[in-house]
């Protein structure tokens, strides 16, 4: 192993072992109403912002996160600390009365809680707005619209904090106090190259699924099978969690695993459990690991420092990933390496990993860069005009926005939704049913041909007669995670009475598992009138991975039970009483799950 050869010594960070930065920060922000807290990954930000939150009088304290797994993780941590905690994501809602904390995704806060006034808001992992422009909008809308009494933005190091402060003040019309820290709780050493045979207790970073697979193959070839006791423990856990992926399990038997978006939630949970219990010591993943998935490791190892189409990664992302090394309470220090053994097939050919490693250490952190996407739903709901939306995007994007181009794009989308989308889809539905060959010919003697044409036109008119219903409701059902085209296509099919099973197959079952989960979110967002038959997506998901919906919180929701009874024509007085009983049973199970602190953790974003 090549360590501490002196080449990168000047970049090492010595740990703040006496927690002095936390003490100083707590004193500095104690009496501040609105705070930006910028501090490196692994520096102990959580302790500081929780102390600040407790000095505020407004309850509950709402903590947002960019992905569900992080909300679940925070929820469990606060439960373990003895607080009354609510959890609300796209799949689970459990919010007790008078709770101390509510943990939720950023979208949930923006769409549901931003109007609450006497609350304290903590927006965690705020640096996510720079990683994902399409998701940045929900953060900026929350900052702009939030009526919370106190707000704290918590983030990893972000370039010139004075520029971030100026931007946040402008968006929120608040006066934020900014506190910047560059200290860690444990020392971090930048070491250079590491031999692949020496890799243990590590996060290995790469940027493609293919690279993950190749790295795992290489590690598997060089490692020995673990001892019998560990293998038996892995088998028991796999049986309990219903894991049957042979390649996946075989890697775990040698203490290694990949971690990426294509894994099922139960597989991700299995990896996390194995890691916590010491049965896996090395995880290979993408830069999504920068979002805080909890793998306490001693080493972070880069197999590439440039992406194929984007070039070298940013200094901000590098530090967020490198900061995962040496988590306090697990290791006394952390180490950051690159690995030439893997860089040969991971790094794009035009780059040299050692060269990039040195250059990125010399770089300064990048300043804030935000490019906002349009909020089409706001316009459809008449919350903003097109002109106001363009002004909002132009005002709060940090890069130059082409006003005329943006206005043209949004205008075209709104025109498409209101004037073209329904008719276009109806024409396709007619063709799918009758084909393109039928036309009316007054000279033909083929009566069957003309009869089919008449049927086709009658069917077309029947569908077109439903346009008013489409126009009256598209704003209500518009799903921000889908494109305008997909929103219009699916809702037109629902309005036109296309069989739910066909809609399920086309939009809910044709992609990967994450697409199924996204379609489920869409269905849940629909008014009850339009959900008929589509809630079967829950059963389809459960067949693949029941933990994605249920965790340990019961098998079927009351809402689902009610809808099924109604569909079956059995929603009579006796059935209603049964539903109420099921509701009490469900509440009892959920309370027991909270008490035992066994809430499932699962991540649904693509990693």
Q: Which residue ranges define each predicted feature?
A:
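N-terminal helicase ATP-binding lobe
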Residues: 1-375, 385, 393-427, 434-438, ...
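Catalytic adenosine-cofactor/nucleotide-binding cores of aminoacyl-tRNA synthetases and other
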Residues: 380
């Amino acid at each position: 192993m090549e360590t501490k050869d002196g080449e990168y010594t000047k970049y090492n960070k010595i740990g703040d072992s006496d927690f002095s930065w936390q003490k100083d920060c707590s004193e500095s922000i104690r009496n501040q109403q609105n705070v930006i807290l910028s501090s490196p990954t692994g520096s102990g930000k959580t302790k500081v912002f929780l102390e600040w939150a407790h000095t505020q009088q407004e309850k509950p304290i709402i903590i947002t996160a960019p992905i569900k797994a992080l909300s679940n993780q925070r929820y469990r941590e606060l439960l373990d600390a003895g607080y009354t905690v609510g959890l609300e994501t796209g799949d689970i809602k459990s919010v007790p009365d008078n709770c101390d904390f509510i943990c939720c995704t950023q979208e949930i806060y923006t769409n549901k809680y931003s109007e609450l006034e006497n609350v304290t808001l903590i927006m965690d992992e705020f640096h996510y707005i720079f990683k994902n422009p399409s998701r940045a909008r929900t953060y900026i809308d929350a900052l702009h619209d939030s009526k919370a009494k106190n707000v704290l933005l918590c983030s990893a190091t972000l370039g010139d904090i004075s520029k971030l402060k100026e931007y946040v003040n402008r968006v929120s019309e608040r006066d934020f106090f900014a506190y910047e820290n560059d200290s860690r709780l444990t020392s971090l050493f930048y070491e250079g190259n590491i031999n692949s045979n020496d890799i243990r207790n590590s996060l290995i970073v790469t940027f493609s699924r293919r690279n993950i697979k190749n790295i795992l193959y290489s590690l598997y070839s060089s490692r020995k099978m673990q001892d019998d006791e560990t293998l038996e423990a892995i088998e028991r856990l796999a049986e309990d969690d219903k894991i049957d992926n042979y390649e996946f399990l075989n890697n775990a038997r040698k203490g290694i695993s990949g971690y990426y978006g294509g894994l099922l939630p139960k597989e991700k949970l299995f990896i996390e459990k194995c890691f916590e219990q010491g049965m896996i010591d090395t995880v290979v993943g993408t830069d999504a690991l920068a979002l805080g998935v909890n793998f306490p490791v001693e080493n972070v190892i880069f197999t590439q420092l440039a992406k194929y189409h984007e070039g070298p990664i940013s200094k901000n992302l590098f530090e967020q990933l490198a900061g995962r090394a040496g988590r306090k309470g697990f290791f006394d220090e952390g180490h950051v390496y690159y690995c030439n053994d893997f860089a040969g097939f991971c790094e794009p050919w035009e780059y040299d990993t050692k060269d990039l490693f040195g250059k990125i250490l010399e770089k300064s952190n990048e300043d804030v860069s935000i490019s906002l996407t349009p909020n089409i739903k706001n316009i459809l709901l008449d919350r903003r005009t097109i002109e106001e939306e363009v002004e909002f995007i132009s005002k709060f994007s940090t890069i130059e926005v082409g006003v005329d181009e943006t206005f043209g794009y949004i205008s075209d989308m709104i025109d498409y939704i209101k004037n073209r989308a329904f008719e276009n889809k109806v024409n396709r539905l007619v063709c799918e049913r009758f084909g393109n060959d039928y036309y009316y010919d007054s000279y033909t003697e083929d009566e069957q041909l003309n009869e089919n044409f008449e049927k086709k036109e009658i069917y077309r008119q029947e569908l077109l007669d439903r346009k008013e219903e489409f126009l009256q409701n598209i704003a209500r059902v518009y799903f921000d995670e889908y494109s305008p085209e997909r929103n219009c296509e699916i809702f037109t099919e629902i309005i036109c009475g296309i069989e739910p099973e066909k809609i399920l197959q086309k939009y809910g079952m044709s992609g990967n598992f994450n697409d199924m989960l996204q379609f489920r979110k869409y269905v849940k967002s629909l008014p009850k009138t339009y959900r008929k038959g589509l809630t079967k997506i829950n059963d389809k998901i459960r067949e693949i991975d029941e933990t994605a919906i249920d965790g340990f919180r019961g098998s079927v929701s009351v809402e689902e039970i009610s809808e099924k009874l109604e569909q079956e024509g059995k929603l009579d007085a006796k059935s209603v009483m049964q539903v109420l009983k099921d509701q009490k049973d469900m509440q009892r199970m959920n309370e027991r799950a909270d008490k035992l602190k066994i809430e499932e953790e699962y991540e649904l974003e693509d990693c």
